[in-house]
Amino acid sequence: MLCYDKRVETLVIRDLGRLDYREAWGVQLETHAAVAAGDAPPTLLLVEHPPAITFGKKGGRSNLLANEDFLASQGFSLYDIERGGDVTYHGPGQLVGYPILPIGRKVRNYLRNLEAVMVNVLAEYGLKSEGSPGYAGVWVGDEKVVAIGVAIKRNVSFHGFAMNVHTDLEHFTYIVPCGLADKSVTSLSKLTGQRVSLEEVKPKLVRAFRDVFGVQDVQHIEDEKKQEVLL
C-alpha cells in the first residue's frame, strides 16, 4: 500500500535518541529541505522528547488546562508549529517519528498508511487498533494510543506521529488532547500490563513502515546528536 507513485528505493532511519523539541524541529526542517531539493533520500527521524506541548494549526490556548508559568516550572516547553491538528503532548516514554517523504498530493492516502503502520505494530502485542473516521490517530477502543499530525510543503511530508509507549499519562491532564474533550489517551504499556521500552518497539516500527510503504532498502544512521534514550 503506497501513498505515492514512485516506489522508495531507500529509506534512511535516523535515530536522534532523546532530543529537545526545538532542536529536533530544526533537524526536521533541514532534512525536509534536503529531501525536497533531491539532495537526500526519504528519511524517517525517530526521537524521544523532554516534556513539550505543541499547538498545531487548529490549536488554541483554550485547550491548555494548566498555567504556562506552572508548566515552565515543571520543565515543559510550549511551541506553536505548522502541523495539522490541535494540541498534543510529547515527553519521555513516547516514540515520536517524523517521516520526511515525497508524497505528492496524496495526503489522505499518506495518513491512512501511517495509521496502518501503527496498527501493525500494535498487532504484534496482540492489540486490535484502528483509525477513527474524522479523527487522526490510532485508537484501541475509545482510547488514543498514537497521535498523528502532519504538514506537507513542496509535496514532501514532515511532522508525523507520536506513540505512547510508557508515557506518563498524567501529563495529558494539562491539555485537552487533540482538542477532544470526550476522548482519553492510553499507552502501550498500560494496554499490555507490562513496561515496554522504546528500544523494543523501534525495530517493529521500522519493519511495519517498510512493509506498508513498500520500501526496498533501509539504512540506519546513528545520529551524532543522539543522547541516551530513556528506557
What are these regions (language model features)?
Residues 97-99, 136, 148-150, 161-165, ...:
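A structural signal for short, well-ordered beta-strand segments
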Residues 58, 109, 150, 173-175:
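A short secondary-structure junction signal
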Residues 61-67, 148-165:
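Short, conserved beta-strand/beta-arch hydrophobic-aromatic motifs that form part
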Residues 2-145, 195-196, 225-231:
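N-terminal lobe of the biotin/lipoate ligase/transferase fold
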Residues 53-54, 155, 170-171:
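Short, acidic Gly/Pro/Ser/Thr-rich loop/turn segments
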Residues 170-231:
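C-terminal accessory segment of soluble enzyme catalytic cores
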